[in-house]
């Protein structure tokens, strides 16, 4: 990709990854502008000192920007972060689900709200230090014969002439891969995103930082949720919600026997052992949470095993639309729009990357075309740390899909993301649903 005179907004967290990303982009010829989001309200600033968007992080990012010779700005996103990430985090626990705030922050803030700042600064792209590969593919110019064989084969079988899209892949460094956290990004976001670290490993990144004498070269990676001190989410929820908003209730085992009482359904997650009443010969685990009755259901390890579940708010990527299409795409069924539709069918601003359909405006596939065929086999990750397992994915109505696991898995947790892969290519993903029939109803 020719980077001449193209301007990039780089999200800088003050860590080694985004710092080296800035250096790599600069070396590739991009005009780089560093931006750090301030996401902490002023009254919470003391607990943000060592966080990725806290005061020290801002100072570190500013120092790196100065060393690289790029401008640096701080943008206040505290109100939006509170509304879109923290409130979501708390409300999911109140609903008996276990949230994934990193996915939400990427979609809504880093690659969402930040785009308005990027446009104001005259930027063409947003870049981050994520470990993932985003390939920008232009499949020809409207002439079927113009689609290079190499592009068609490298992009999960896409041979649709004249369609511009982005393919999300796992990082070369599988231990650090973060493609899972980017699954919910829409094409309008992926097509304007750059992830320069995707083809590098963490040791290589640190070595580059040391060679540049960056002070953050050996900075320790954050291993916890950035807004939860000490990774103690229960204390955070008590502070954020207040004890009176906790939903107290009763604990039952899977046979319907009363076990005890609890101080709030928000304090539990599927697979949890800590904090449960004793008195059982075998270890007890949380196997279900019922927000309607505020009941916590416990069982033994075998009760955590699941062979099928559903996901909703599914976001399919072009790799799935094409590699698993039910039939060849029909030119007569295309829909011209000036924006890219989100899952709620509301349109956002046009992508900065025009699609090469010879002046006929931007295009997107119809809803029917954007679904893969009814069922196919893929690899599914049910949490970030999960290695992935073979599954049969069946598309359902209303942006839902059913995941069948030939090899049943432990602790499939409602509220977490299930991300679907074909080898290293992200096909899509969605949010794990709670079983429609509660455990005690069986």
Model regions and ranges:
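ATP-dependent adenylation/nucleotidyltransferase module used to activate substrates
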Residues: 1-183, 194, 204, 286
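AMP-forming adenylation/ATP pyrophosphatase catalytic core
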Residues: 127-134, 138, 148-154, 163-330, ...
């Amino acid at each position: 990709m020719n980077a001449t005179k193209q301007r990039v907004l780089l999200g800088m967290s003050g860590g080694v990854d985004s710092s080296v990303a800035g250096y790599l982009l600069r070396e590739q010829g991009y005009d780089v502008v560093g931006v750090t989001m301030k996401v902490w309200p002023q009254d919470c600033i003391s607990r943000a000192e060592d966080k990725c968007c806290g005061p020290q992080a801002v100072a570190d990012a500013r120092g790196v920007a100065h060393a690289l010779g790029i401008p640096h700005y701080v943008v206040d996103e505290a109100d939006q972060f509170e509304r879109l990430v923290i409130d979501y985090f708390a409300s999911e626990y109140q609903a008996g689900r276990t949230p994934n705030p990193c996915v939400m922050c990427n979609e809504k803030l880093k690659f969402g709200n930040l785009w308005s700042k990027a446009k104001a600064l005259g930027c063409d792209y947003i870049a981050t230090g994520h470990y993932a590969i985003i390939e920008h593919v232009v499949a020809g110019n409207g002439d079927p014969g113009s689609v290079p064989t190499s592009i068609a084969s490298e992009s999960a079988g896409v041979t649709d002439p004249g369609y511009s899209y982005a393919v999300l892949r796992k990082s070369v460094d599988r231990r650090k891969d973060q493609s899972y956290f980017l699954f919910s990004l829409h094409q309008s976001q992926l097509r304007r995103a750059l992830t320069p670290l995707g083809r590098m490993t963490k040791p290589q990144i640190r070595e580059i930082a040391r060679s540049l004498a960056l002070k953050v070269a050996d900075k320790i990676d954050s291993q916890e949720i950035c807004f939860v001190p000490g990774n103690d989410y229960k204390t955070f929820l008590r502070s954020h919600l207040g004890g009176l908003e906790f939903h107290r209730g009763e604990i039952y085992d899977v046979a319907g026997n009363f076990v005890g009482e609890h101080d709030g359904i928000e304090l539990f997650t599927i697979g949890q052992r800590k904090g449960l009443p004793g008195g059982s010969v075998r270890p007890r685990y949380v196997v279900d949470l019922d927000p309607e009755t505020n009941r916590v259901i416990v069982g033994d390890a075998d009760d955590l095993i699941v062979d099928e579940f559903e996901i909703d708010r599914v976001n399919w990527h072009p790799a799935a639309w094409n590699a698993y299409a039910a039939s060849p795409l029909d030119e007569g069924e295309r829909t011209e729009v000036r924006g890219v539709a989100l899952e709620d069918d509301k349109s956002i601003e046009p992508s900065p990357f025009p699609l090469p359909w010879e002046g006929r405006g931007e295009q997107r596939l119809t809803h029917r075309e954007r679904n893969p065929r009814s069922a196919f086999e893929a690899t599914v990750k049910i949490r970030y740390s999960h290695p992935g397992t073979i599954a049969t994915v069946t598309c359902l109505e209303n942006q839902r899909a059913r995941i069948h696991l030939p090899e049943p898995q432990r602790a499939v947790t409602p509220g977490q993301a299930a991300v679907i892969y074909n080898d290293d290519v992200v096909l899509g993903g969605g949010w794990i649903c709670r079983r429609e029939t509660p455990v005690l109803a069986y």
